[in-house]
């Protein structure tokens, strides 16, 4: 690994020199190419330089401990060494992740779809909890979340919520979240205090640009209707809601969140493009899966991937066997430990 990182750092320094070369600057196309390549290596080089600095500090601390006769000072040095070792391990894990082969979709924004599954009203409330968890995670990452469409229940749950998450590397962090999420808790409506199990499904789709997916307008059937609100009551009398059916695949997208029919159509097309691209990629993944099974599961949307147990304050990811006893912080968007583990295991598959 060190050899590879040394080679990357050398390449980074070469690019740095080229970017400052007046001859290269004069050739704008070449200069832009080098700037882009330089930027792509910046993160891994910064982490590697931090890693080398920590390794040097560890070596210096060990040398100091060997020569230090004072026991109190040796104990202080040992505490510092423990701290540095933990820092080194964390940086090593980050480097392993940064060295993983890039997924062509990693830098894309995502369409996040959450649907209440088995469990009625409790499942809808859990779908709302999951949406909040991902929204809080997005905030922590400096990303932007926008609800594209939502089907609310009377007590604040979601039968379905579709959102767009935009930012740097969103898909790279979110791609392993697709699947069935299960919750075990005592519902607020349950007088007997019994634990109920319900579920919600999550689908994470890379946002597709028009160049990624070609859609023939003749393949679309577009219906317009009056949008309805909570409990089915009419929100407005104009036909602003849109339903688009992609005839060849049978994929249907309905959108009624906006008051403008044009905006609803635009959002529906965004979701349709993402679903069509996802369909193509799922078919491709299934072909690969027949020869290589991923260590983080099949990626099948019907696969149960995670359990959230409220009485035990526990969350378990079944694909990597990771259990954390801090469900409260996970639901508040503290997902990095789970996501990092999934990325590392997924990259080694």
UniProtKB/Swiss-Prot annotation:
Cellular-component GO terms for this entry: cytoplasm
This protein's record includes keyword Lipid biosynthesis: no
UniProt keyword annotations, A-Z: Cytoplasm, Methylation, Protein biosynthesis
SUPFAM superfamilies in alphabetical order: Release factor (SSF75620)
A Gene Ontology molecular function term of the record: translation release factor activity, codon specific
UniProt-listed InterPro entries: PCRF, Pep_chain_release_fac_I, Pep_chain_release_fac_I_sf, Prokaryotic/Mito_RF, RF-1
Cell compartments where the protein resides: Cytoplasm
Positions of post-translational N5-methylglutamine modification: 233
Post-translational modification, as annotated: Methylated by PrmC. Methylation increases the termination efficiency of RF1.
Pfam families cross-referenced by the UniProt entry: PCRF (PF03462), RF-1 (PF00472)
Function per UniProt: Peptide chain release factor 1 directs the termination of translation in response to the peptide chain termination codons UAG and UAA.
Similarity-based family: Belongs to the prokaryotic/mitochondrial release factor family.
Name of the protein this chain belongs to: Peptide chain release factor 1
Organism: Pelotomaculum thermopropionicum (strain DSM 13744 / JCM 10971 / SI)
Gene name in the database record: prfA
């Amino acid at each position: 690994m060190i050899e590879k990182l040394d080679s990357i750092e050398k390449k980074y320094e070469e690019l740095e020199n080229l970017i400052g070369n007046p001859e290269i600057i004069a050739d704008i196309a070449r200069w832009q190419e080098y700037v882009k390549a330089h930027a792509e290596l910046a993160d891994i080089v910064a982490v590697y330089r931090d890693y080398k600095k920590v390794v040097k500090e560890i070596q210096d601390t060990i040398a100091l401990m060997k020569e230090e006769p004072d026991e109190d000072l040796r104990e202080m040095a040992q505490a510092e060494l423990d701290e540095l070792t933990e820092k080194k391990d964390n940086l090593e894990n980050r480097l392993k992740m940064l060295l993983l082969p890039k997924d062509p979709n990693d830098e894309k924004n995502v369409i996040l779809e959450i649907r209440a599954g088995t469990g009625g009203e409790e499942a809808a409330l859990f779908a709302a909890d999951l949406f909040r968890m991902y929204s809080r995670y997005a905030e922590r990452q400096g990303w932007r979340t926008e609800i594209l469409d939502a089907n609310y229940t009377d007590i604040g749950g979601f039968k379905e919520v579709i959102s767009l998450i935009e930012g740097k590397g969103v898909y790279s962090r979110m791609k392993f979240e697709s699947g069935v999420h299960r919750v075990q808790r005592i519902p607020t409506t349950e007088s007997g205090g019994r634990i109920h199990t319900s579920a919600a499904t999550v689908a994470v789709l890379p946002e597709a640009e028009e160049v990624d997916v070609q859609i023939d307008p003749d393949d679309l059937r577009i219906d317009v209707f009056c949008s309805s609100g909570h409990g089915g009551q009419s929100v407005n009398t104009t036909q602003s809601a849109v339903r688009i059916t992609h005839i060849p695949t049978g994929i249907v997208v309905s959108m009624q969140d906006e008051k403008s029919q044009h905006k609803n159509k635009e959002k529906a097309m965004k979701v349709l493009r993402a679903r069509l691209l996802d369909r193509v990629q799922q078919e491709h993944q299934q072909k690969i899966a027949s020869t290589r099974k991923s260590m983080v599961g099949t990626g099948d949307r019907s696969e149960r991937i995670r359990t959230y147990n409220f009485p035990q304050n526990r969350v378990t990811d079944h694909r990597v066997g990771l259990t954390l006893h801090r469900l409260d912080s996970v639901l508040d968007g503290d997902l990095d430990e789970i996501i990092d583990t999934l990325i590392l295991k997924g990259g080694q598959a």
